[in-house]
């Protein structure tokens, strides 16, 4: 491969490409989450009739996947480049393949496959038709058409593209370990992230206070419900994200039994559904401001 972009150059290339194709460039959301889908820029905006086109990098924390900075590709925190487009463009797959070309990956020279992998996130009431994108036998992207988010049907359909930046960069730079990636010229990925990987793994598996985390979950849940009662969508959703991350820490610590796990996930899911319903209702009160007049007319005609 001729063009070995740094991780930083990859991000800038994707930002420029998707911006030129109508996406707003958002910034990473400042609350811990397990995936870019859980950002309010995806979760909330995928529901309701308003159009939404956004792209952003999202650091995603998965405590159970931490490996003390010793595993070449299993990470406590990885980075996703998230693209969300509603309504989904007819040529979304072609746009994706075009973006790969700009990263130096010519689809005509590589084995690129869309492998069916329908997606769901039960804890957030989400599901959709999906594909894993495989590049020469390695998964690099998740491609999803949302059918349901927060228990609500998605009309119009939202398309989501989630690039796994570390995996994609490992392929482009031809390295075996993510820690050998060049983040920018002269600075390795490991020089930035190996210490936090070690420390967060040690905390998640050995040091975290289970009793405190259990109490925190209950407190965050209580506060989320208070916000829901006041129809405060975004504060409520922040506390739901805190509940989700706290659960993931408990799960990594082995503090949650199989039976308890289902109960915790149901508690998170019920709150997520409530927030989704309130969000759509509040946007409707505002007249769905991101809809243009033609879409208003079309909606009324239906």
Curated annotation (Swiss-Prot):
Name this polypeptide is given: Glycine--tRNA ligase alpha subunit
HAMAP family (UniProt xref): Gly_tRNA_synth_alpha (MF_00254)
Name of the coding gene: glyQ
Family: Belongs to the class-II aminoacyl-tRNA synthetase family.
Top enzyme class: ligase
InterPro entries: aa-tRNA-synth_II/BPL/LPL, Gly-tRNA-synth_heterodimer, Gly-tRNA_ligase_asu
Gene Ontology CC entries for this record: cytosol
Listed GO MF terms: ATP binding; catalytic activity, acting on a protein; glycine-tRNA ligase activity; transferase activity
PANTHER family with a match to the protein in the record: GLYCINE--TRNA LIGASE, CHLOROPLASTIC_MITOCHONDRIAL 2 (PTHR30075:SF2), GLYCYL-TRNA SYNTHETASE (PTHR30075)
One Pfam assignment: tRNA-synt_2e
UniProt keyword annotation of ATP-binding present: yes
Organism: Enterococcus faecalis (strain ATCC 700802 / V583)
One annotated GO biological process: glycyl-tRNA aminoacylation
Transmembrane segments: none
PROSITE patterns: AA_TRNA_LIGASE_II_GLYAB
């Amino acid at each position: 491969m001729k063009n070995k972009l740094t991780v930083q150059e990859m991000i800038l290339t994707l930002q420029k490409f998707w911006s030129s194709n109508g996406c707003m460039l958002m910034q990473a959301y400042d609350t811990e989450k397990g995936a870019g889908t859980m950002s309010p820029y995806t979760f909330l905006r995928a529901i309701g009739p308003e159009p939404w086109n956004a792209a952003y990098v999202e650091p995603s924390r998965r405590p159970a996947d931490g490996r003390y900075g010793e595993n070449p590709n299993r990470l406590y925190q990885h980075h996703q480049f998230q693209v969300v487009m509603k309504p989904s463009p007819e040529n979304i797959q072609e746009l994706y393949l075009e973006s790969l070309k700009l990263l130096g990956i010519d689809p005509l020279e590589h084995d690129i496959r869309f492998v069916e992998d329908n997606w769901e996130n039960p804890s957030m009431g989400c599901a959709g038709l999906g594909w894993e994108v495989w590049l020469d036998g390695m998964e690099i992207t998740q491609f999803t058409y949302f059918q349901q988010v927060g228990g609500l049907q998605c009309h119009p359909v939202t398309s989501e593209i989630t690039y796994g930046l570390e995996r994609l960069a490992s392929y482009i730079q031809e390295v075996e370990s993510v820690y050998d990636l060049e983040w920018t010229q002269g600075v390795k990925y490991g020089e930035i992230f190996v210490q936090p990987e070690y420390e967060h793994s040690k905390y998640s598996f050995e040091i975290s206070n289970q009793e405190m985390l259990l109490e925190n979950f209950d407190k965050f849940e209580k506060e989320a419900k208070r916000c829901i009662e006041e129809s405060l969508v975004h504060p409520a959703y922040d506390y739901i994200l805190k509940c989700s991350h706290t659960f993931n820490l408990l799960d990594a610590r082995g503090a949650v039994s199989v039976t308890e796990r289902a109960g915790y996930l149901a508690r998170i899911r019920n709150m997520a559904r409530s927030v989704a319903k309130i969000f759509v209702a509040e946007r409707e009160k505002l007249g769905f401001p991101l809809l243009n007049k033609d879409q208003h007319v079309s909606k009324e005609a239906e």
